[in-house]
Amino acid sequence: VSDLTQAFGKVPFAFNWLGCDMGLVSAHKLGGPKGIGALVVRQGIELPSQLKGGGQEMGRRAGTENLIGIAGFAAAAEAAARDLANGLWDEVAEIRNILESELSATAIGTISVGNGVRRLPNTLCVAAPGWRGETQVMAMDLAGFAISAGSACSSGKVRASRVLTAMGFDE
């Protein structure tokens, strides 16, 4: 199972390119409603039913579908597809690259994680050795920037990122 939530609508891809059996996407990352998502399942993969009952979702999950959420997700996905086709995310990537260059030039010692490789256009990961994340977040907030010291799904955790550790970064 691959979490495609951040990439969906921001970079061109087709599920069959990825070589995974299942992929998850969420509407709220596209500006759609919270609480609605999609599980894309490769043809031939059998999933056991999670809730027994009616034949909704091809027998995989019984219960009334969230039609308003589905419609909101569809509208957000269509808007995201238009933005992608119109080059919006290319412009966002250019702005990210400018910010990254300026940080490297002015904030001595910062490390840009993922520089030089394909990555999401709207995400910049910067490490600043010797600075506590909480201190950076407060200072940047006071300066008018919205940053975080980790992902929203990891908020409240005090251990190092497994991904950054696997990439060779220290805690």
Label the predicted regions.
Residues 1-171:
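Pyridoxal 5′-phosphate
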